[in-house]
Amino acid sequence: MKKISVILTTYNSENQLEEVIDSINNQEGKGELFELELLVVDDCSTDNTKSILLNKRVDFQFTRENTGGPNHGRNLALKLCTGEYICIADHDDIWFPNKIKKLLAVSHLAQIVTSGYVLSDISSLNEVVRVSKSADKKGYLEYESNETFLSKLTKSKVGQQTYLGSILFHSSLKHILFEEKYGMIDFDWVLKLFYNQKSVEVCSALYLRKVDGSNLSLDENYRINDYYYSLKAISVYENEYSSQVKCAENRINGSMGRYYYLIGNMKLARKYLLKSTIEIKTILYLITTFVGSKFVKKYFKIFG
């Protein structure tokens, strides 16, 4: 019987933690198709998170001090886990009952398997299903070696769904660790994971990802850290994939420019947009940094 290690990091997670844990522990096929190992690492929560873990009889580790993000806890758990396959869960991800079973069903095809998901905005009550379509009735897509790596490297909006909560990967890749300088960025980890690897995507939504209006991606400090660390992450591949890295640089700058456009800092928006790919869309953004931005923000999606 295969063993699945599930890594869950927590910090002040009391609102949804019981539902998250139950969704993991109540997976179809548990004890029949696979054995489940749940590893929880808490980052010095100050709410009732630890009490909930104790009441649910969940063994957990905890960091000596708050590290400012989930990555240190993920690395601790990666070093402790003993499963043949590994999943990483966020404390606001609710797994559907068939998640592991469906991922395992195609795990013989590649060492990395992902799926689609449902994005639920708690503040607006809107839900968006993010699932790739299969051209046939197999219900999954196969990606050649480096196909997904290159789409992630170039910041392409098309290709395999690789949000962290969707990934099942073989334990032979557990040596790939997360950055701990900022403690919350996973772009470089995804690049390292998919480098020189084939992968498979199950064309179904297998979990619910809950977010709210105060999305971390809109925090300026997070954006600045993500910007510089993303540039550092892609530079590793410059000798091997120079044109793709240049494309990535342009898109990273474009994203930063649109972020500042969205929050109304037009001077910085122009600075980064001028470093991006100069195309009609970019020119229109640049022009409307002087006049017309309110109309653009009202009727068009700018960022995220």
Please report, for each region that a protein language model flagged, where it lies by residue.
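A conserved acidic beta->alpha catalytic loop
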Residues: S23, D42-S51, T67, D90
